[in-house]
């Protein structure tokens, strides 16, 4: 059994759960999600976050929309879908 692989899988699962919990509070863009995770003392970088967001979007757990930003290019805001809310409720019960 590869302990490093198990650690990576656990970390990924925890990050996915945390992302859903952040989005449960309201829509957010990637840098806000990273900031919230860092505030919770979780180490995460964009290269880790974007694949997780893409996977969760492909699973139907979240969606996104583009919004103009007064400080530069448009921002992609992520939000939970109903399926994502239901899935998060199941995760809350499991934890």
What kind of feature is each model-predicted range?
Residues 60:
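Glycine-centered, phosphate/nucleic-acid-interacting loop/turn motifs that mediate DNA/RNA or nucleotide
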């Amino acid at each position: 059994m590869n302990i490093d692989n198990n650690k990576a899988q656990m970390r990924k699962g925890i990050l996915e759960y945390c992302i859903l919990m952040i989005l449960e509070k309201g829509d957010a863009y990637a840098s806000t999600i990273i900031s919230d995770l860092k505030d919770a003392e979780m180490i995460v970088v964009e290269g880790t976050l974007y694949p997780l967001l893409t996977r969760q979007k492909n699973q139907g757990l979240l969606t996104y929309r583009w919004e103009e930003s007064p400080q530069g290019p448009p921002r992609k805001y992520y939000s939970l879908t109903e399926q994502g809310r239901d899935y998060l409720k199941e995760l809350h019960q499991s934890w």
